[in-house]
Amino acid sequence: MLTEFLRDHPVRELLSGGTRVLFPPAEDRRAWEGIPEGYRREIRELAGKYAAVTWPARTASGFLAFVTTGSRRADEDPYFTRRRKLCAEVLDACLDPDAVMDDIVDGIWMICEESTWVISAHNVNPIPGAPAAAEYPLPDIRKPYVDLFCAQTGMILSLTASLLGKRLDAVSPLIRKRIREEIRRRILRPFMATDDFWWMGFRRKDLNNWTPWILSNILVCAVYDPMPRAKLADLLERACGMLDRYLDTLPEDGGCDEGAGYWNMAGGALLDCLEILEKVTGGKMAFRQDEKIRNIMAFPAKMEMGGGWFANFADCDARPFISGERLETAGRMLGDPALAALGIRMRGTVAAQLNDTPHLTRALDLIFHAPAEAAQAAEPGDTWLPDLQVRLVRRGGWTLACKGGHNGECHNHNDVGSFILFRNGEPAVVDAGNMVYTAKTFSAERYTLWNVQAEWHNLPIIGGHAQKQGRDHAARNVKRTPDGMELDLAGAYGEDAGIGSLKRTFALDESGLKLTDEGLLREAQETEWIFLLREKPEWENGMIRAGSLEIRCPEGLEFSAEEKPVTDARMARNWPGSLWRVHLRGRKTDRFRMEFVFSASGREA
């Protein structure tokens, strides 16, 4: 799409009417003094908090810990603390023209002195011919690699140099020169010189959020670098080719199999790239009417369960941080009032943009964004994403999210045919979602983690056999129905499960959900149904009661339940306390038709 446009519109000509200033520098006092007081106060508080934080050491032993112990935090804690502290102090210095620059200069110099801007978990990830991290656990500074956070560090330093340029020069002109050379050495030169980084799409086609996320930051680095227009044009054209390869991997329905939470740095990062291209070309590169782009931008609104909750299939958080400013901007840009309204409701804070992996451009987008008043949002409709095979249905106080797809998705969980059920905006039947990333998360040991296993999703287990991972283990005969979806789950299991067919049907109405499973097996086997519940379940006469939820079960099932205390820090943000796994064991048979009815508890009716 982008490359095709550039065939008839040379980038060098497009750049003649654009700007290379993405945000106002600190000396533009009118702009910085016009920032809303709430944001000004928050920035001052953040800067005060980080002023008390000593610049942490980033050590070789901390970097090595990813290989020696599996810990990412030993390297990432000091790594991201440095960058959060720098971002907070830079924003504060932009507000205060008399701010002392010493601590900021220390942070800049320290980051420039780092052997690598790549985090330990991404070391040599994966460059053709490079040894595995276990054999090569420290970075080779002769072979710079660009990962997510190397590019993001370049963005932070580029903006720091632009925002505080004259004040940094007053300390020493060598500071900005050092920033420029480090960005060129670590990011811009490798970007132009090699096709080997997997996220570029030359060597691999299975691209994900890495591509737009990295490119959005490289574009900031390039725009602020004083390179000649011809060189910038070459870089932008190369980046557009990579964005096209990323877009080619996405389905026409705009769905992101990484989950709504990953839209932030997938579709949201794509929006960053498109905005930068619009600005530097004076609006000549604009793709607002492209149907696929519109679908990508609207994806989070289609996945909302209500009240800040989202359908959290795969490695998505149930209550993810999504940039409300990006959502609102996308909604305004595309004329999508539902998307804009969601963004206004999720407007967020400066601190949220700097938490986790600090994103200075998003913080600047937020504070210079003139938010609209929250409009009365229309009632959300149903969602059907035919390529992703995800369905959301809303009836009365109930919201159902269910999926088909396959078990080789990005950030995959073995969850073909699983579902999530909310009542009155509160979770009832849930997906546990994500945990803190470790060395196991994206390794051959991924499926030893309980939260990704089929046995912890809302699925049947046939003769002791759960679903298997891999793209070939997929749903069949997936059909949208007026009130839900039907699909055959048999293909998601291995041949050893002996399943001829396993049809699952979802039907939601204002009274609740009817879930029907019909199985034909090659021989008589015991089937077990798993439901993961938010509240503690009780069993009485074929009925499960869990908080405000009631599940009427078929006859002849044996009930048991287990508490799963949520001890993982990331998961606990979504599910403090415990989750509860229900087991319903049936008798041996070679065929069955089982109907489960989920409704409001009679004690509340």
Label every PLM stretch briefly.
Residues 1-43, 88-94:
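Extreme N-terminal leader/anchor segments
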Residues 47-58, 104-122, 175-199, 234-254, ...:
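Long, well-ordered core segments of solenoidal/helical folds
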Residues 135-259, 365-376:
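Active-site lining segments of carbohydrate-active enzymes
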Residues 267-428, 480-482, 575:
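Carbohydrate-active enzyme catalytic cores, enriched for enzymes
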